[in-house]
Amino acid sequence: MRTTQRMLEVLQLFTMEEPEWSIDAAAKKLGLRQSTAYVYFRDLVDAALLVKARIGHYNLGPAVIVYDRITRSCDPVISLAQPLMKELMASAGVECVALLCRIYRMTVLCVAQEATEHADFAVSYERGRPMPLFRGAASKICLAHVERRKLRRYYEEFKADISKADLGTTWGEFKSALRRIRSTNLYITTGEIDAGRTGISAPIFSPEGEILGSLSLVVSEQATRGSQGLLEKLGSTVAEAATQLTGSLGAGSATAAASDRKLKGHKKKKKQAAARTGHPRRTLKRKRKSAA
């Protein structure tokens, strides 16, 4: 295994459940020599990705916060989604929370969240908190579009949880359940994550057609019961916004590719022109020698 990969494994040990690690504990967990683990910790501390906590123990360092700020400001998915999330909330007509989630190592991770001014409820999809793929609208709509190879491994690992989530008791039933979700391109659940809350989610795709994540609205179950046709209206607007976001990502990618091709073409023309006329500096030197 490559050194960089092993070092990343050290970094991935740090979680909400285990936010602090010693070099000795990390070495045992990953099957490393203590001297090797020491080098990895030293390099991660030098990069400010880890900091010393109490004696012999380490926590995540300030560099993580710097990268988080860069992600918030520069991630094109977040930048393009936030105006759409605000529009979704403004047009909903009820108090709600808008979520932007991305797939992260076969979990779903909220990367941006917006709420209406008087939304008096919290949601479990907190920013930066990995959530399972088999519960909740924001997760299930992503799970339905995961590639088959990864899906089979995931099923074998979480077979019992998938069965409890009413997604099938066999591999065949599981595939059929996901096929039904894919066919609607929208998924709505009530009370699967938070009691009394309804989640309405649609998928977001990369320019290559791979599943990136989901765009969602969370409203109170009471609001949907008290307003006829509200779920249909919100479902339609969420699906439309997700489609628009996918299209914007594709357009941005196409623009960048066209710009890159144009730049390469310009450089190629300059090289061809230089080859035809000779290098300008060399030509100038030859002229100066002739004059002398």
Could you say what each language-model-derived stretch is?
Residues 1-22, 26, 87-115, 239-261:
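An N-terminal domain-start capping segment
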Residues 91, 184, 195-196, 212-272, ...:
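Juxtadomain coupling helices with adjacent low-complexity linkers
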Residues 198-202:
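Short hydrophobic beta-strand micro-motif common in sensory/regulatory domains
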Residues 204-207:
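Sensor-regulatory modules in signal-transduction proteins
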Residues 60-157:
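Amphipathic alpha-helical effector-binding/dimerization core
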Residues 1-74, 78, 243-248, 291-292:
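N-terminal helix-turn-helix
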Residues 120-193, 264-270, 277-283:
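Short, solvent-exposed recognition segments
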